[in-house]
């Protein structure tokens, strides 16, 4: 079974050499996929489109993630709807071949409790699943 590596990129990596990334290795494994940060809440990452298009042009598989700022399930669903709209508006339908992920890691969100965080994740993922 072949083994591959992947990375995540965002505004924190403004200058990416996508071709070098494609030919690079992580822990000896070739880089095959990249998870690109789409947004912080519903504010698009300023390098989202550049990163997605650069990775696709280099022949890398692309997934995206949304760094959530939601405080409840309705806001999480709105984040998912925003992401779907953004993907469609930028003609990325069918080009995102790796998962769409939900990044829930703000300390203030942990304080909401397990039930609320679970409901937020479910609302986001159910909305994404209906799109896919």
Regions found by a protein language model. Give the residues of each.
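Substrate-binding cleft of extracellular glycoside hydrolase catalytic domains
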Residues: 2-125, 129-131
């Amino acid at each position: 079974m072949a083994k591959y590596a992947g990375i995540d990129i965002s505004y924190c990596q403004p200058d990416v050499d996508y071709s070098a990334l494609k030919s690079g290795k992580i822990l000896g494994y070739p880089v095959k996929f990249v998870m690109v940060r789409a947004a912080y809440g519903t504010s698009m990452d300023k390098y989202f489109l550049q990163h997605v298009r650069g990775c696709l042009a280099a022949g890398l598989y692309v997934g995206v993630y949304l760094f959530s700022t939601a405080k409840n399930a309705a806001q999480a669903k709105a984040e998912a709807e925003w992401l779907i709209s953004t993907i469609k508006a930028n003609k990325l339908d069918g080009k995102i071949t790796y998962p769409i992920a939900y990044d829930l890691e703000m300390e203030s969100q942990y304080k909401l409790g397990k039930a609320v965080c679970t409901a937020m994740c479910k609302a986001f993922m159910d909305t994404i699943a209906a799109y896919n």
